[in-house]
Amino acid sequence: MPVRKIGWLAGLGVAALSLTPAGAQVFSPLSVPVGDAQLKLSGEAGGALFNPNQPGWSGAEASGDVRLMPELRRDYDSGLGLDLGGTFAAQDPLSRGRYDGDVIERLAARARTGLGKIEIGITDGAGYDLAVSGPKVDPGVSLDDPRTTFYRDPGTHRAVTDIFALRTEVGASSNYAKFAYTSPEVFGVQLALSFAPTEAKEFPFLNAGPPVPGRQADIWEGAIRYETDLGPASLSAYGAFAEGRAEHKLAGQEGVSDLGAGAKLDYPVNDDITLSLGGSYRQSNAHAFNVNQSFQAGTTRAGYVSTALSYKSWMAGLEYSNGIADQVAGAPRLNQNGLEASLGYTISSSASISSGWQHLGYSRNSGAFFNGLPQLKLDAFYLHVNLKTSQE
């Protein structure tokens, strides 16, 4: 399908769905009483149609993902709340996201009190939980931490972005089994701390993780988030760190060390229009943010900036990203840069759609990519639809 047709399809899709009555697209979660507890089943799905312009691949492509999120919850008169919840996903190779295609993305027990939240199980770390970045029209297809990408390695059929995925939020402990604590917000300040004993994705301490050199253990993450009003504007900012210990090390390998920060400013021009801008930065000794490639010599740095303008249910945005992974033993120096322009429309609390254009460029100081060259240029026009159960 020619690029022009994809562009027209994206524009027509946004226009058509924007005319649909909002109330018709609100999906409520299924809720069933179980004794004194409540069982709630939520879900979400995303689907993309796009036309990638890349070496070795042509024509229209599609990708998508589906998630089910059951939660069993019990609230007590004392203010204590207990729940057991999970996220179970199915996706194709271009929508594997930051959890690398895990079927079980989250499965954790949680206790909530006036003193904060405690989680035990497969869940995100403190840094990722409190992360702040620039505004995103559609987080699912953003340059930063996307769920869906548009480019496929013609040899492996996996996402090209597996080479170096830009994720500026601190997240060294991924969804490894862990203990996590998040404080309540006090005077705009919120704190979080997490500990993952291993890289295993079971209950903490039950498994040592994958049998690979440089395997990480004892990963601590800490984060602080601050929110305040600056006159009519609102500001959010965060900073985070992660530190781990390497096992079965090769020469030069060490425990992962991760630092990151981000901020976002929202300014309401009037009752209908809001201008937003922000960004985030991360640096790590993990080559291309692969924690099993953490080396004493070599740093990976990534930055992301974006701005967006919202008008009622519409949102237009522009994103820029850049990443550099220093050369380490067995891996070349990698450079990545990206640019994205997008337009989105929120149909209801359960449905939204976006379309846009994205460019990614990669380069390396030795060897070649699948196109036989040390440079790789990619771009795509896309249409992306999001559906989810409403929390309202």
Question: Where on the chain are the PLM-derived regions?
Answer:
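Outer membrane beta-barrel
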Residues: 29-49, 57-200, 226-229
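Membrane-embedded beta-strand positions of outer-membrane beta-barrel proteins
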Residues: 41-43, 84-86, 118-122, 191-193, ...
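Transmembrane beta-strands of outer-membrane beta-barrel pores
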Residues: 47-51, 86-92, 124-126, 195-199, ...
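Outer-membrane beta-barrel architecture
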Residues: 69-71, 108-110, 180-182, 223-225, ...
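Repeated loop/turn-to-beta-strand initiation elements of outer-membrane beta-barrel proteins
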Residues: 78-82, 115-119, 188-191, 231-237, ...
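Detector for outer-membrane/organellar transmembrane beta-barrel domains
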Residues: 222-341
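Outer-membrane beta-barrel "beta-signal"
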Residues: 376-392
